[in-house]
Amino acid sequence: MIEKIWSGESPLWRLLLPLSWLYGLVSGAIRLCYKLKLKRAWRAPVPVVVVGNLTAGGNGKTPVVVWLVEQLQQRGIRVGVVSRGYGGKAESYPLLLSADTTTAQAGDEPVLIYQRTDAPVAVSPVRSDAVKAILAQHPDVQIIVTDDGLQHYCLARDVEIVVIDGVRRFGNGWWLPAGPMRERAGRLKSIDAVIVNGGVPRSGEIPMHLLPGQAVNLRTGTRCDVAQLEHVVAMAGIGHPPRFFATLKMCGVQPEKCVPLADHQSLNHADVSALVSTGQTLVMTEKDAVKCWAFAEENWWYLPVDAQLSGDEPAKLLAQLTSLASGN
């Protein structure tokens, strides 16, 4: 239903307009206060890069963060990552992730980023505290990438990157809750790089698509072509589950059942195992897999995806960030 409201297919969005005007008024006032320096943003002693969205819902932001961190690491840059830690609840903040940190403590996306990149990752509702925690333990870090937080204006940033779903784009264009917008599309004029996941990119936008890898068994680490798996039940607890189901079909998999879950939904053995019957194979997203390691069964697999950016602009962006991190 919410997708139909946000896309404009359902007339119910008009009933939510008063709340959207209120949301826009409050969010605009907050940004204006920082722009006029009525409120002071905290500036880190190293460059900060924000990777965020203008809309609610999954746009492919986390794969972009992983891509960015890995690309900078390959260039010899020491990167730290901070996040709000949605879906997790730590005993205290800031929380610096370790090999023992669970998704219940830090949230699924920070744990995924930590496992994929081995970069220092910290979470806190106050992102400046997370930055301070990283720099205190890892003073050699040269640049901070913040996973989400475009609207977290109390943290000063040097570069802003926005990820857009190229198919859904901005829906009906209205602020939450009548539409998907956290900020209106005009905000793109001040963004340093706009990355478009799928669809047809417009002038000045960087095309991106998600490239699936081999399926990985949660219990054994065995890898295989996902098309070799039989009697598949697909599970996705991400911002936009249909994208994952479409990826499976693109890989030649026709799931017997597709199970969309809420983004950041907590998972347990009983609930997940109930999704599959004897002889079926469960295939989930990597974001779901980090929540299932402790209780995974032998017929549970996940499909990792990597962001693939096209054109000349990604190299220019990486050169800019490398120069920033190097102090040039």
Curated annotation (Swiss-Prot):
Reactions accelerated catalytically? a lipid A disaccharide + ATP = a lipid IVA + ADP + H(+)
**EC number per UniProt:** 2.7.1.130
- Listed pathway(s): Glycolipid biosynthesis; lipid IV(A) biosynthesis; lipid IV(A) from (3R)-3-hydroxytetradecanoyl-[acyl-carrier-protein] and UDP-N-acetyl-alpha-D-glucosamine: step 6/6
Entry-linked SUPFAM superfamilies: P-loop containing nucleoside triphosphate hydrolases (SSF52540)
Instruction: List the NCBIfam families hit by this protein, alphabetically.
Output: lpxK
Q: Which Pfam families match?
A: LpxK (PF02606)
Similarity comment: Belongs to the LpxK family.
InterPro entries linked:
LpxK, P-loop_NTPase
> Is Ribosomal protein one of the keywords?
no
Q: Where does ATP bind?
A: 55-62
Superkingdom, natural source: Bacteria
A single Gene Ontology biological process assigned to it is: lipid A biosynthetic process
GO molecular function, a single term: ATP binding
GO cellular component annotations of the record: plasma membrane
Using the UniProt record, name the top-level EC class of this enzyme in a single word: transferase
- What is known about what this protein does? Transfers the gamma-phosphate of ATP to the 4'-position of a tetraacyldisaccharide 1-phosphate intermediate (termed DS-1-P) to form tetraacyldisaccharide 1,4'-bis-phosphate (lipid IVA).
Keyword Lipid metabolism carried by entry: yes
Q: Which keywords label this protein?
A: ATP-binding, Kinase, Lipid A biosynthesis, Lipid biosynthesis, Lipid metabolism, Nucleotide-binding, Transferase
Name this protein carries in UniProt? Tetraacyldisaccharide 4'-kinase
